[in-house]
């Protein structure tokens, strides 16, 4: 049984069958860069980061493209408000976006194309649409004639008749029909502009993604993703202009993330009910934010509450405590010559939970269900460590290997597992613990306390239990 994805286009789950064997080509709509990213944006990019990570974990080569819309009405408006050059404004917020995604441990896309660097490609694409009879020039720009594309509405279910009643269409003086949308906007005074066969101007919003995705992923590719709010009009219009140009199916699977909700309303800039990524990172670690997002399936609405974030923080601490318990137990572990009933119980619990994890992720990347399996392993291994005098090294390693998979797929615990010289570090820590133990015996408590304090600064906490001392890693605040 392979990976199943929910395809917005067909409104059902389908087995993922990439166009090229062993490779998934994926395009995710990137930001319009005029302001700081908020949690609603982060939710989408964390979700697609985990989807990509899981596909790579399952052995696929993933080619991922994410665009930057660096010229747009919103950018021009913000630049006019601030007196900043639109290009410099966009450049500044591209840097902000990349910094925020890096802080959230979102892996970089393979290619980040920008609209302003693909103007010639966009012009060529529009020329093809005109040649094929799908586009026309009006007084204020070039438009796509929606009624010429017979499959319009197949993604969103919207009907042309409804659009003609004035629902969710952009204004335009030169349109033939209300539903038609701009491919090229003729220049207005003071706006950025480029030469074209239709006079100076700039691209419309929808044409950008069709051009840039196809340039790097081909005229047909596997996955196109974004937030639910992009289904109409953006993705619907992308399909229309792309399939009109190429004459065949453009994208095989359409994936969309649910909204982040605040007291029953969508988190958005327009409502002013948003919290920026930077504000969140002042209060919570990147891993807490990732875990908060992953506690819900990517297609489900995600309620933003402080209680929810605190719950994620507590859960993350539980998992880190489990990792430390395993590490400490490894010191006392023994090789397996014979298994007891409790050994078998622990092994079976890990095996069953591991299967549940993969089953959940194979079922449209259901991170909420997969996390339940993670906590099943956590509970089982903690119980095992408490109940046996000498845990079996092989069982502890199986639990640790499972958590490494979780780290790889969910983007948590990465620093914990990245320490290449961990073995040497542990030997040095053990040596310092022994030196401190001797100092305490000699009642040289000032030096013993100095070692404890210096180790604490490095994230190593010592706990004295009678004559013995146990150490564990902690987050340095």
From Swiss-Prot:
Coiled-coil spans in chain: none
Keywords of this entry: Aminoacyl-tRNA synthetase, ATP-binding, Cytoplasm, Ligase, Metal-binding, Nucleotide-binding, Protein biosynthesis, Zinc
Catalysed reaction equations from the record: tRNA(Cys) + L-cysteine + ATP = L-cysteinyl-tRNA(Cys) + AMP + diphosphate
Protein name as it appears in the record: Cysteine--tRNA ligase
Gene Ontology CC terms: cytoplasm
Family affiliation: Belongs to the class-I aminoacyl-tRNA synthetase family.
EC number assigned by the record: 6.1.1.16
Signal peptide start-end: none
Needed co-factor(s): Zn(2+)
GO biological process, one term: cysteinyl-tRNA aminoacylation
SMART domains: DALR_2 (SM00840)
Residues annotated for Zn(2+) binding in this entry: 29, 209, 234, 238
Gene: cysS
Taxonomy, superkingdom: Archaea
Motif 'KMSKS' region, residue numbers: 266-270
Enzyme class at the top of the EC tree: ligase
Subcellular location: Cytoplasm
């Amino acid at each position: 049984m392979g990976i199943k994805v929910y395809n917005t286009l067909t409104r059902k789950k389908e087995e993922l069958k990439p166009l090229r064997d062993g490779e998934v080509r994926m395009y995710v709509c990137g930001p319009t860069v005029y302001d700081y990213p908020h949690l609603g944006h982060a939710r989408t990019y964390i979700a697609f980061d985990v989807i990509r990570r899981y596909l790579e974990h399952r052995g696929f080569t993933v080619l991922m493209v994410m665009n930057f819309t660096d010229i747009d009405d919103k950018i021009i408006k913000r630049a006019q408000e601030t007196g900043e050059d639109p290009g410099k404004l966009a450049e500044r917020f591209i840097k902000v976006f990349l910094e925020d995604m890096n802080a959230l441990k979102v892996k970089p896309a393979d290619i980040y194309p920008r609209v302003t660097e693909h103007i010639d490609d966009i012009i060529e694409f529009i020329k093809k649409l005109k040649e094929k009879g799908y586009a026309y020039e009006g007084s204020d720009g070039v438009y796509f004639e929606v009624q010429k594309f017979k499959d319009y509405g197949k993604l969103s279910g919207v009907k042309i008749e409804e659009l003609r009643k004035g629902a969710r269409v952009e204004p335009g003086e030169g349109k033939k029909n209300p539903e038609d949308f701009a491919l090229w906007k003729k220049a207005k005074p003071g706006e950025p502009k480029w030469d074209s066969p239709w006079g100076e101007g700039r691209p419309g919003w929808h044409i950008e993604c069709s051009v840039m995705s196809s340039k790097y992923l081909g005229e047909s590719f596997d996955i196109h993703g974004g937030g639910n709010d992009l289904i109409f009009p953006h993705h619907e219009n992308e399909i229309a202009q792309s399939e009109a140009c190429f004459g065949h199916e453009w994208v095989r699977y359409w994936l969309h993330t649910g909204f982040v909700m605040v007291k029953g309303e969508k988190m958005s800039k327009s409502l002013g009910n948003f919290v920026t990524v930077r504000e969140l990172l002042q209060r919570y670690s990147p891993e807490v934010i990732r875990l908060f997002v992953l506690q819900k399936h990517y297609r489900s609405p995600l309620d933003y509450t402080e209680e929810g974030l605190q719950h994620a923080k507590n859960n993350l601490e539980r998992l880190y405590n489990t990792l430390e318990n395993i590490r400490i137990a490894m010191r006392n572990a023994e090789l397996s010559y014979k298994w007891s009933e409790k050994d078998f119980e622990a092994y079976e619990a890990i095996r069953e939970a591991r299967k549940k994890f993969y089953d959940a992720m194979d079922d449209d990347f259901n991170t909420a269900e997969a996390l339940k399996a993670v906590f099943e392993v956590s509970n089982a291994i903690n119980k095992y460590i408490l109940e046996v005098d000498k845990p079996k090294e092989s069982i502890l390693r199986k639990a640790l290997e499972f958590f490494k998979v979780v780290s790889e797929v969910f983007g948590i615990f990465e620093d914990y597992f990245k320490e290449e010289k961990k073995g040497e570090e542990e030997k040095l820590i053990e040596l310092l613990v022994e030196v401190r133990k001797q100092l305490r015996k000699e009642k040289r408590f000032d030096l013993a306390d100095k070692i404890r304090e210096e180790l604490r600064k490095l994230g190593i906490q010592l706990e004295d239990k009678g004559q013995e001392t146990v150490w564990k890693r902690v987050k340095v605040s």
